[in-house]
């Protein structure tokens, strides 16, 4: 019944408790969603979320699709909540370029997420929230080391660079292995062999060694990496809802265990390098970093001091940059080839015309193979197997498209949306490499720059350059000599499963045929 003061009167303690609870929830929602906004700016729009969990249910099993749909309603800059944490989501090519490139200093941070502290003991350059001068100097050091032992020329090599030498050896191994599997079984799953070959390339660059494909030590790395991607696929609400860290969570426990094992493995290999290190005889990236570390210790004025642990974490980051993304790219490429035999034939016709069958493809052939490049770009775009960049954060108060974004805000960058934007691509769901070619058959560089897979700006993937080159060379060598298909009557499932990278279902029904003319093993 009404009270004498015009407010509702409560007839029981239960009603009173319910009213107080409702008021508190309402106050909490207003509190967590309200931010002071400078005059002339607006808060990013977005849907209302549920108390305590925010938009966790809205994201669902395919966050890239859910957030793309929301961007169609709310625009290129929108805001959601995960738990009580506000997250700004960026879509649209121009908006993302504005944020990560033109305003790159504002958006170069990483959010201080709990799961990030578990990777490389919280010292990873890739995942660490630090974005200051020391981080920038270490990143340049890592980039230079990677360049020196991958794409820089070396007159002592028969190949143009270390990367070409390592990829050529592994591609030749795969050709022999696939032939053997066809003779013995008649079909196979290429992923289980690709992943080991790609791991061998980055092992050679980082550690100066190649493993046999049945080596248990190498297989342990491969298995850890596969498990890492599977475990991270479920995401970590504990990053945004702290109480979940203290509740039983099998995925979180597995994530912790995998990171400890991977870090221990890296530490073991690097300790071995310290033990066998000889100044003036630099074998690989790890030796290069050890030399830098020792030289800087003698120079008190050096601006980049490296501890032994920092050497481990840099190698950790470089290994990660050159492994999962490349394996996934080649694997998706093979899936598109067997489902589009016309495209496979066109690539092989181009290889025959430009290179022939008397020698092996080289990195220097890349500019003369525009259709193969167009195919790779379309694979990157259509699969968008890295749907989001690693989350960014703002390091200062800033604005974007008229919307105010405070310092320390977590920022998601939806690469999948850009690669499937109908305004950019017209028919984004069609797999059509020709879209990247001009009327004269050359590569359309302007359009190719609109594909986003490796991020942009100050935090873009450190392994982008070698990744693109490695995918190109593996495919060129394999397709020059072999034709890929699947067993008659079998279908491939290209439905992507969400994770750290989008993965297709494994297919055990691949077949290869050596191409009808030309030697099987060509001169490099």
UniProtKB/Swiss-Prot annotation:
Assembly and oligomerization: Both Cytochrome P450MT2A and Cytochrome P450MT2B interact with cytosolic chaperones HSP70 and HSP90; this interaction is required for initial targeting to mitochondria. P450MT2B interacts (via mitochondrial targeting signal) with TOMM40 (via N-terminus); this interaction is required for translocation across the mitochondrial outer membrane.
MF-aspect GO terms: arachidonate monooxygenase activity; catalytic activity; demethylase activity; enzyme binding; estrogen 16-alpha-hydroxylase activity; estrogen 2-hydroxylase activity; flavonoid 3'-monooxygenase activity; heme binding
E.C. number(s) listed in UniProt: 1.14.14.1, 4.2.1.152
Catalytic reaction list: an organic molecule + reduced [NADPH--hemoprotein reductase] + O2 = an alcohol + oxidized [NADPH--hemoprotein reductase] + H2O + H(+); estrone + reduced [NADPH--hemoprotein reductase] + O2 = 2-hydroxyestrone + oxidized [NADPH--hemoprotein reductase] + H2O + H(+); estrone + reduced [NADPH--hemoprotein reductase] + O2 = 4-hydroxyestrone + oxidized [NADPH--hemoprotein reductase] + H2O + H(+); estrone + reduced [NADPH--hemoprotein reductase] + O2 = 6alpha-hydroxyestrone + oxidized [NADPH--hemoprotein reductase] + H2O + H(+)
Cofactors: heme
Protein name: Cytochrome P450 1A1
One GO process term, biological-process aspect: steroid metabolic process
Induction, as annotated: By 3-methylcholanthrene (3MC) and beta-naphthoflavone (BNF).
Binding site for heme: 461
GO cellular component, one term: mitochondrial inner membrane
Function, as annotated: A cytochrome P450 monooxygenase involved in the metabolism of various endogenous substrates, including fatty acids, steroid hormones and vitamins. Mechanistically, uses molecular oxygen inserting one oxygen atom into a substrate, and reducing the second into a water molecule, with two electrons provided by NADPH via cytochrome P450 reductase (CPR; NADPH-ferrihemoprotein reductase). Catalyzes the hydroxylation of carbon-hydrogen bonds.
Family classification: Belongs to the cytochrome P450 family.
Domain notes: Contains a chimeric signal that facilitates targeting of the protein to both the endoplasmic reticulum and mitochondria. A 12 amino acid sequence between 33 and 44 functions as a putative mitochondrial-targeting signal. The removal of the first 4- or 32-amino acid residues from the intact protein positions the mitochondrial targeting signal for efficient binding to the mitochondrial import receptors. The membrane-free P4501A1 seems to be more sensitive to proteolysis.
Alphabetic keyword roster: Cytoplasm, Endoplasmic reticulum, Glycoprotein, Heme, Iron, Lipid biosynthesis, Lipid metabolism, Lyase, Membrane, Metal-binding, Microsome, Mitochondrion, Mitochondrion inner membrane, Monooxygenase, Oxidoreductase, Steroid biosynthesis
Region Mitochondrial targeting signal: start-end pairs: 33-44
Gene encoding the protein: Cyp1a1
UniProt-listed SUPFAM superfamilies: Cytochrome P450
Residue sites binding substrate per the record: 228
Residues with glycosylation annotation: 71
Gene3D superfamilies according to UniProt: Cytochrome P450
Post-translational modification: Two forms; MT2A (long form) and MT2B (short form); are produced by NH2-terminal proteolytic cleavage. This cleavage activates a cryptic mitochondrial targeting signal.
Species the sequence originates in: Rattus norvegicus (Rat)
